[in-house]
Amino acid sequence: MAIRSYRTYTPSTRNRPISSYDGRVRSNPQKKLTSGQHRCGKGRNSRGIITARHRGGGHKRLYRQIDFQRNEKYIFGEIVTIEYDPNRSAYICLVHYGDGEKKYILHPRGVIIGDTITSGPRAPISIGNALPLTDVPLGTAIHSIEITLGKGGQLARAAGAVAELIAKEGRSTTLRLPSGEIRLISENCSATIGQVGNVNANNGTLGKAGSKRWLGKRPRVRGVVMNPVDHPHGGGEGRTPIGRKKPVTPWGYAALGRKSRKNNKYSDASILRRRK
């Protein structure tokens, strides 16, 4: 989708670029493919304690049930609509399959209404088709990649995301992920050909604080203006420094350059090169 700018009629619209929604993108989903979401206590756990900071509020949403597993093997489906999904940055497509099933999938870049897609081993190498990695040629752009066989696509699902198949050896394939990480995936895991659509999703600007509140994101307060009980940087009279050699997190860990990934994770053996 293209980027357009608002005319300046309020301060929040001055020079504000956003993704333009053309007439093909709809916002009224299929009722049978949606479900409600329990949004009480956003960012809290079952005891009401904040586990994810700066979350809360936001507009009500219906969850669109996305088919990440692509179980309709060897059945052709037609792209009927391209729709907006408030729960993700990418657009979604409504697919009508030949057996009468209707399912949502992520919108691959370049797929238009009326196109036909399919899935399964030895499916054609065309955009939108899903097939095992063992049948994908080297150098192919893919997205919605399985990590565990049968669990459905988990990698490269955001708007504009694309991974590359760079090697095959034994029962494993080597992928270069959007983060720059290079990791091994079983050759039996499936992936979808092409790149996720809405590549300009990150080129827009929110323009005002209220737009961020609509997304369920609350303000981020600097630690230096808090009290000592709330943050290690807090306290002091007026504009005082943090009182430490290096910045730290609210829990006292180094804030700059410290690796947050846990040691000895089960997936360490599959990662050949860490992300950038």
UniProtKB/Swiss-Prot annotation:
Q: So which domain of life are we looking at?
A: Eukaryota
> Which spans does this entry mark as compositional bias, Polar residues?
7-18, 27-37
Q: Does the keyword Cytoplasm apply?
A: no
Q: Which UniProt keywords apply?
A: Chloroplast, Plastid, Ribonucleoprotein, Ribosomal protein
Report the Pfam families cross-referenced here.
Ribosomal_L2, Ribosomal_L2_C
Gene Ontology BP, a term: mitochondrial translation
- List the InterPro entries: NA-bd_OB-fold, Rib_uL2_dom2, Ribosomal_uL2, Ribosomal_uL2_bac/org-type, Ribosomal_uL2_C, Ribosomal_uL2_CS, Ribosomal_uL2_dom3, Ribosomal_uL2_RNA-bd_dom
Q: Could you tell me where this protein is found in the cell?
A: Plastid, Chloroplast
Q: Which GO terms describe its cellular component?
A: chloroplast; mitochondrial large ribosomal subunit
Region (Disordered) residue spans: 1-51, 224-276
The terms under GO molecular function for this entry are:
rRNA binding; structural constituent of ribosome; transferase activity
Family statement drawn from the similarity comment of this UniProt entry: Belongs to the universal ribosomal protein uL2 family.
Q: How does it assemble?
A: Part of the 50S ribosomal subunit.
Q: Which NCBIfam families match?
A: rplB_bact
**Protein name as catalogued:** Large ribosomal subunit protein uL2c
From which lineage does this chain's organism come?
A: Eukaryota, Viridiplantae, Streptophyta, Embryophyta, Tracheophyta
